[in-house]
């Protein structure tokens, strides 16, 4: 009887840990999401990369996105 109770509690603990892990993973920002700073909560293997936008020489603000770590975008030559 003790073995059945112990096994049930162990299974409940494992299921609870799996659920908590799934909730923590869902709390991060996926690829392509807008983030606010370089230290935002992008998912693992992603970083928050920011750039400044200019239109006709006038700064239009800063945009930040969650992109794969190490990936860099550059301006296309016209």
UniProtKB/Swiss-Prot annotation:
GO terms for molecular function: toxin activity. Keywords: Disulfide bond, Secreted, Signal, Toxin. Residues 23-26 form a propeptide. This is U7-lycotoxin-Ls1a. It holds the Pfam family Toxin_35. One of its GO terms (cellular component) is extracellular region. InterPro entries: Spider_toxin_CSTX_knottin (IPR019553). It comes from Lycosa singoriensis. Belongs to the neurotoxin 19 (CSTX) family. 07 (U7-Lctx) subfamily. Expressed by the venom gland. Contains 4 disulfide bonds. It is found in: Secreted. It comes from the Eukaryota. Residues 1-22 form the signal peptide.
């Amino acid at each position: 009887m003790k073995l059945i109770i112990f096994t049930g509690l162990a299974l409940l603990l494992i299921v609870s840990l799996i659920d908590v892990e799934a909730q923590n993973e869902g709390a991060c920002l996926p690829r392509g999401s807008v983030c606010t700073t370089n230290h935002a909560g992008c998912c693992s293997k992603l970083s928050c990369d920011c750039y400044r936008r200019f239109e006709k020489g006038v700064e239009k603000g800063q945009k930040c996105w969650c992109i794969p770590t190490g990936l860099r975008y550059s301006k296309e030559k016209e």
